[in-house]
Amino acid sequence: MSAPLDAALHALQEEQARLKMRLWDLQQLRKELGDSPKDKVPFSVPKIPLVFRGHTQQDPEVPKSLVSNLRIHCPLLAGSALITFDDPKVAEQVLQQKEHTINMEECRLRVQVQPLELPMVTTIQMSSQLSGRRVLVTGFPASLRLSEEELLDKLEIFFGKTRNGGGDVDVRELLPGSVMLGFARDGVAQRLCQIGQFTVPLGGQQVPLRVSPYVNGEIQKAEIRSQPVPRSVLVLNIPDILDGPELHDVLEIHFQKPTRGGGEVEALTVVPQGQQGLAVFTSESG
């Protein structure tokens, strides 16, 4: 499996916690409409324009969980550069000429340019099953000032008390905007979900929280297609005659010249010979 495909699948897994919450909402909607439940829940993923903003990552390891925006990691080979222009029309003009000659004082650099395409997930199909011993706790205010450990401890104490409808907590996990709690005995999760609303003391304030069923979701099928990145181009086969900073300046000057079809450069990252890089793409709104 290619590295870009691995990166796309990894980004998909990072979104799984958010998708679990959405699966629960979809199931509730079916109940309201009187529809019969189904095991598989296919839905389309909205198209998200991507842009490289100059962030790179040296270590190929990616965090196991992601709290906010979609991120796709694109490997950059040795002797290459990634350029993002302010205007997508400039990128189109640059790509019309597949080989560029960069004039320098003592020599010329001949480099190739090509469009950048990233693998994007277009459709996800997941199987879902309500967990009998786990719940999802939501409603945490952004102003809450507690560390992860403090928050989990306080929730375990509160929902571990039988007078609050709870029981012994044996699993706890912080998710994006929510917390998953697992209980040692049957019936506790169902009882808490029936109550639904709780006021929990957190950080010196009384915080209203919602408890809902936790959905175990597993990706069954993912359709992937290549999507062009309209404002970015790859520069390849850069010879090893300049160091990184000097090469960066030479490329930026060349590709900003209107006479070469260039224009304003928003971000430029160079990977010299003997090195490797990882470009991080986020959504346009990110």
From Swiss-Prot:
Maturation and modification: Phosphorylated. Dephosphorylation correlates with the formation of a complex with NMI.
Highest taxon, organism lineage: Eukaryota
Molecular function per GO: identical protein binding
Main location: cytoplasm
InterPro entries assigned: Nmi/IFP35_dom, Nmi/IFP35_N, Nucleotide-bd_a/b_plait_sf
Pfam family of the protein (one): IFP_35_N
Tissue: Expressed in a wide range of cell types, including fibroblasts, macrophages, and epithelial cells.
UniProt keyword annotation of Nucleus present: yes
GO biological process: innate immune response; macrophage activation involved in immune response; negative regulation of cell population proliferation; negative regulation of non-canonical NF-kappaB signal transduction; positive regulation of inflammatory response; positive regulation of innate immune response; positive regulation of non-canonical NF-kappaB signal transduction; positive regulation of toll-like receptor 4 signaling pathway
Assigned keywords, A-Z: Cytoplasm, Immunity, Innate immunity, Nucleus, Phosphoprotein, Secreted
Induction (UniProt): Up-regulated by interferons IFN-alpha and IFN-gamma.
Assigned GO CC terms: cytoplasm; cytosol; extracellular space; membrane; nucleolus; nucleoplasm; nucleus
Domain NID, chain residue ranges per copy: 81-170, 183-266
Residue span of region Leucine-zipper: 5-26
UniProt similarity note: Belongs to the NMI family.
Subunit structure: Homodimer. Also interacts with BATF. Interacts with TRIM21. Interacts with NMI; the interaction is direct and is facilitated by TRIM21.
Domain statement: The NID domain 1 is involved in the negative regulation of p65/RELA transcription and the negative regulation of NF-kappa-B pathway activation.
UniProt function note: Acts as a signaling pathway regulator involved in innate immune system response. In response to interferon IFN-alpha, associates in a complex with signaling pathway regulator NMI to regulate immune response; the complex formation prevents proteasome-mediated degradation of IFI35 and correlates with IFI35 dephosphorylation. In complex with NMI, inhibits virus-triggered type I interferon/IFN-beta production.
Protein name per Swiss-Prot or TrEMBL: Interferon-induced 35 kDa protein
The species this protein was found in: Homo sapiens
